[in-house]
Amino acid sequence: MGLITLILALIVVLFVCVFASNSSKPANNASFADNGAQRTAREFGPAARGGELLEFERWFKDTLATVFAQKAEKVANPTRAWNAETVFDNLSPWTSAADFGTVCHTLIGYCVRYNSPGDALHHSPDLANNLISGLRAICARLPDPPPHQQAPWGPVADWYHFTITMPEVFMTVTIVLDNTPHYDEAAALTRHWLALYLPTAVTSMGWHRTAGNAMRMGVPYAYGQLLRGYSAQQIAQEPGVQETLKTVAFPYVAAGNGLHPDSIYIDHLDVRAYGYLINSFFTFAYYTRLFGADVVNTEGLTRAIENVGSPEGVVVPGVMSRNGTLYSNVIGNFVDYPIAVHSADLSKVLTKLSDSYYGAVVGATTRLAYYEADPTNNTQAPLWTMTRRIWNRRARVINYNANTVMFESGIILQSLNGVLRVPSTTTSTQSFRPAVGKTALAKTRTAGAILVHARFAEMNNLQFKSCTLFYDHGMFQLYYNIGVEPNSLNNVNGRVVVLSRDTSVNTNDLSFEAQRLNNNNSSDGSAFNGVVCQRVPITNFNVPSLTVRSPSASVELVEQIISFQNMYTASAVACYKLNVEGHSDALRAYRINMDEVVYVTTGEGVKALFAYPWLMLKEDAAVVFMSANEDLVVPMSVINNAFSAIDEPGLQYAPVNCFLYGNGFRLNDSLANLQFQFEIIN
């Protein structure tokens, strides 16, 4: 009898060891699908709520409102009425994939309300019932097994709602219901359906996803694995998770997709396209929480956002979407933006954020696209390449519409209606690089300057040299050598937009025409939405006067007219400045002799010299040089000639980030910085 008892005890111990060994292995979705008994025990039993799962769920709830504020695609503060059949009224989510997406986003929005202590629906039992009922309704309609390379319903292109948003619904509903009687059911449904629709961190419905899509998929996948009892360490070793962690690591790359050494985000190989980054940014907090602070290049990503964004959500259009926008509803929540000037010397982006305004310019380089078109968006190339303006941070944000998107400050118009198409010749996206693209940037403590030489073959060989200076409360802009393909304008004069007014928005500003009449028939000083424009005369340049025009009833413009004859000979000029309303300055600009040298002084300690290919910027005791040719050595003759041109020939200086090299100075490190910095010592 004792021997039999001992044998039985050994069998029990052996069974426990085998079970423990199996439970430590990564999820096997094939065996999950084949083994009904294992599926019932594993997917519909109570959640294995270990320490890591509990800690993650608690942290998720504590940070939900903050992270939700960083999420671009969402329904915030939903009030839509609930419906027993369709989850919400006036939707058809079981036949329309778009409506299904709306249901998903609305459920997540209600989860945020349920979780927010100050909300009237905080921990509402009725809302908790509605949330679990919504989850049940989704589960009742989803195909099991999932379709292969096809959306459960609707067009194949609508896979996104089922692969990206739906798993986030399962995760969010489950976590916010953790202290309710519904939690075990929600957790069981999440384990089951995520195993089907997210079998790995990078696959769904037969497709393998990468980049921004994989970033989104990885978080609910990892949560599903936590629910199954796996540790974060085990989850991190799975091949799909490893693949995603390599993506979110954002190592610096010299070319192609990812974060370039000067912290500009590149997508589609050569496009400054921040869309994926903006849509996925909120996930980085989850990855660092689950897998450690070092799994994400937080420093580089922070700089990438600072390089283009603002607290108000205004972003220079040249890094945004193909349909033309200057605004992100979430980027202002990503980082704490310092008052600073940022320059990306290799990717050619200059940004200034002051107390009073945000301004940025995207320059040109043959390494990167100046525009990306697709079959339905092909008219924003001028917006991406020529936006030259500031936005008053105390004024309202007015985004573009179909009537205004062609008429931004700085755009060189080749027709009266502003339409200039650069179409894709493929069925997908197509990027276009400049035929000539050379840019120098310089920044000091409060000022930034950018010198651009560009030619764009697809825009009638439009070419120009552009000189921009950002300084306290204002921006200076000069175009010279503006030209196009001869005889391409039908002998119609070109125009440069100085200031644009959206007439559908009431800002209490008078029309430009009324302001002109009230100012002795002069448009100098015309204002809209907190920004004032002025013509800037320059010695030895024929700078056009400011004129007013209304291309349609929806938009009114202050412009400078440039003759088609001058554009045909690449000799057209335009020059203006923009100031924050309520501020003025004593800015002056001079052409030195008849050379290609322009000296600009603000009268308040900032001086810029645009001496193509060299750019110099001086502020107080700091002086910076950069070459549009990206030279690694600045000759002493360039420095001395620049100081003479700004009437300070006797300046003594010491190198800061460069060293004496023959008859010039060589940069210490040119990996991401191409600006030569000097300190004035007398």
UniProtKB/Swiss-Prot annotation:
Protein name: Occlusion-derived virus envelope protein E66
Location of the protein in the cell: Virion membrane
InterPro entries: Baculo_ODV-E66_core, Chondroitin_lyas, Lyase_8_alpha_N, ODV-E66_C_baculovirus
Principal subcellular localization: virion
Disulfide partners: none
Function statement: Component of the polyhedra envelope.
Gene3D superfamilies membership: 2.60.40.4340, Baculovirus E66 occlusion-derived virus envelope protein, domain 2, Chondroitin AC/alginate lyase
Taxonomic classification: Viruses, Viruses incertae sedis, Naldaviricetes, Lefavirales, Baculoviridae
UniProt family annotation: Belongs to the baculoviridae E66 family.
GO cellular component: membrane; viral envelope; virion membrane
Keyword annotations of the record: Membrane, Viral envelope protein, Virion
